[in-house]
Amino acid sequence: MSDGSLPRVEFWCELQCPDCASALDDVRALREAYGDRLEIVLRHFPLDKHKHAFAAAQAAEEAFEQGRGWAYLEAVLARTEELGRRGEALLVDVARELGLDAEEMDTALIDGRHILVVDADHAEGKAIGVTGTPTYVVGGTRLDGGQSQEGLRERIVALLG
């Protein structure tokens, strides 16, 4: 959690997006540099062009509920092409590989318990001008990494002060 001295960083992400997989390097670097002083929050922005992105966002929410959200996010983003081919079967397999309750993951995808969270994130993203992923919001300033990730980490660090 943030101690209040640094602005919160929202990481608007889509789990079938190869650019988001690359953006994890920036997230890791920020975590390494700032540790627990920096709050990085995952926000979902599934894109229509990716068939399994909405289910993947729901699965990520379930993984956070089971206490392994960031590990799950990284594991799925490392396999974006496979997600495109295998869909929900991969999402459940990744949960199992990470020691999560895979049966509960499957149930969460079936019963849609996380749909409202994903829908709310997507609606808020549209409202603030998110058009692609990855996008960051740092202290109210939006940085669109979907256009170019060149120099993005440096711009985030500059906004953190």
Language model features: what each stretch is:
Residues M1-S5:
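Short beta-strand-to-loop junctions in surface cap/lid or active-site-entrance loops
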Residues L6, W12, D19-E32, D93-G161:
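C-terminal cap of thioredoxin/glutaredoxin-like
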Residues R8-R96:
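Structural alpha/beta surface segment adjacent to cysteine/selenocysteine redox centers
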